[in-house]
A protein has these predicted regions:
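N-terminal helical cap/lid subdomain that shapes the substrate entry/recognition surface
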Residues: 1-56
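Asp-based, Mg2+/Mn2+-dependent phosphohydrolase catalytic module
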Residues: 51-55, 67-186
């Protein structure tokens, strides 16, 4: 027995007993989704981390499975685009997350050894991609992923406000040192 996927428009038509202007409803839904996306502010701590990274002389890159114009449009709207040394998006690669191609490209463009890279991710596919690229990954779940459970990331933060960038870097350095020393002892 196969079960068909739930279609909310079909269910609504069934409930009201008449057909609905589907295309018009879909357009309204997309417009509302866009309105919600465009009203979202910068997440807490993001701007401070980017400013601190600049002051520390750290290179910053962004890897997104979205289209480049979407990504750069949001970064410009939020006043964050100038913080990034490189930005790579779906248009720049053959395969997006969970494939590591995006992260590999960003790391290559930054000219930083993979073992010195820290990835901040909000999606499970992003975590998988970062780990496949051999990168240290910190998971900061978003509203959609906060209820998920994953042990794939090296560290989880609920918000960048939980810890300063300098304290986080010290913690990550300590954690990496402990991992390396355990590996050599085994």
């Amino acid at each position: 027995m196969t079960e068909e996927a739930f279609n909310p428009l079909e269910e609504l038509e069934y409930q009201v007993g008449t057909s609905l202007p589907r295309e018009q409803l879909i357009q309204k839904q997309h417009a509302r989704e866009m309105e919600l996306v465009l009203s979202r502010p910068v997440l807490p701590g993001v701007k401070e981390y980017l400013e601190d990274a600049r002051q520390m002389g750290l290179k910053t890159g962004l890897a997104s499975s979205s289209k480049c114009d979407w990504v750069t449009g949001h970064l410009e709207r939020l006043g964050l685009i100038h913080y990034f040394d490189t930005i790579k998006a779906a248009d720049d690669v053959q395969k997006t997350k969970p494939d590591p191609e995006l992260f590999n490209l960003v790391v290559e463009e930054l000219g930083v050894p993979a073992e010195q890279v820290i990835v901040f991710e909000d999606s499970v596919n992003g975590i998988i991609s970062a780990k496949k690229a051999g990168l240290f990954c910190i998971w900061i779940p978003n509203m959609l992923t906060s209820q998920l459970s994953t042990d794939l990331a090296d560290l989880r933060l609920d918000s960048l406000n939980d810890i300063s960038l300098s304290d986080l870097l010290a913690s990550v350095k300590s954690q990496k040192t402990n991992i390396l020393s355990r590996s050599f002892k085994e």
